[in-house]
């Protein structure tokens, strides 16, 4: 699957394709207990636990699809990952390595451009701007390169229209987005289902927050399927989540 995607990139068919995978594991934990331990050992800004017709979903997402607050649009693309170091010195060395990795930086710049383009399709003219570009944000198990992209939502454009323009997130699809999604549909062995969807809230005043449904597990008959992130990175942050989830199971 990965090699086929690389050939698509080499041929110029697409610049980037973000492939996904499903890891099926057995566990004695219930979904709520899993969520509680995940929150303790691998906290993220957007954590969730909720029932669906397919099973209970629990997860720890670091990333937004989109937030609109008082008509300000906000997207924070994440691309570029390293594991956390054993101490502050190791963390600093890994951060320097991450910020000097041309592959990671090129991927991140591409996603900034994609976010600017997506927001620009429905934002007020000349309102799209990038702030705090290429900063490293540290989480419990990993560190990521993160940038912030803003725009102003004009009157007459609803949050639903805005989300429809941005969805799915570029970090879960690729660039150009439509062609990347076609390739994903061709190459991935399973339909994504809820993976890569949105989880969040809508307010009556028009504010909205939708996080990306990644780094999550769906519990079916008390078992778990781990919906992981991009397969193209050698230092895949999924492995860090899988490791964190393994720590949950070892405590059971």
Language model feature labels by segment:
Residues 1-252:
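Extended alpha-helical targeting/anchoring segments
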